[in-house]
Design a protein with these regions (language model features):
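Contiguous, structured surface segment used for ligand recognition
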Residues: 1-95
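Acidic/histidine-rich, surface-exposed loop or edge segments in extracytoplasmic proteins
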Residues: 40, 100-101, 166
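Second-shell loop/turn segments in exported
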Residues: 45-48, 101-105, 169-171
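Conserved, mostly hydrophobic/aromatic
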Residues: 50, 98, 119
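Aromatic- and acidic-residue-enriched carbohydrate-binding clefts of CAZyme catalytic domains
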Residues: 91, 135-179
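Boundary/entry segment of secreted carbohydrate-active catalytic domains
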Residues: 93-103
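A conserved hydrophobic secondary-structure block that centers on an alpha-helix together
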Residues: 101-134, 141, 176-178
Length: 179
């Protein structure tokens, strides 16, 4: 938010709702991933029983802002206002996930992080990350270095739906233990 608004982070934590601030209240009566978001002339109040509920409430709050909030450049002309609203929400399904198959098509660490950010925007809670298969081994195991030395790179990629037509370009990558 500070990047696109050109200011500092507007979130503060306090017992009382500060001017133009957000108050977070633990409410054990709400389901684990549920939340209540109340925006009125007094400020913003978020109620949840656990961390996931608070996270999903903040995602909803962010979605109430102009689309420029998802940008990477300052947008000083955007109307950085949140409309008055009352939202009570909880997921219908416990498992809400997406599959990322890096065994067949490698994604950089930054791309994986962006993928997870987009999952969070949509309040998905499970990443099914396919790290190994015949097409690639994508995780470093220091005891078995040949897994990545050999298994992380393929000699060529099929360029058509016809078997036997390859581009001749080596392709691949893997994630280090530090990453």
């Amino acid at each position: 938010v500070p990047t696109v608004t050109g200011g500092t982070n507007p979130v503060t934590v306090a017992d009382e709702v500060p001017a133009s601030g957000i108050r977070f209240v633990t409410d054990e009566s709400l389901p684990a991933e549920g939340y209540e978001l109340n925006v009125d002339g007094e400020g913003i109040e978020v109620r949840a029983s656990q961390f996931p509920g608070f996270l999903y409430a903040l995602q909803s709050l962010e979605q109430l802002l102009p689309a420029a909030v998802y940008g990477t450049e300052p947008a000083p002309d955007a109307a950085w206002e949140v409309p008055c609203v009352k939202i009570a929400d909880a997921p219908r399904f416990a498992y809400r996930g997406m599959h990322l198959d890096v065994a067949r098509h490698f994604f950089s660490v930054d791309e994986v992080k962006r993928y997870i950010d987009v999952m969070a925007i949509h309040k998905l809670n499970t990443l099914h990350w396919h790290l190994t298969d015949d097409q690639g081994w994508r995780i470093e195991i220091k005891r078995y270095p040949e897994l990545t030395a050999v298994g992380s790179i393929r000699k060529a990629t099929v360029v058509r739906k016809e078997w036997g037509t390859y581009d001749g370009t080596p392709y691949g990558g893997f994630y280090t233990q530090d990453e």
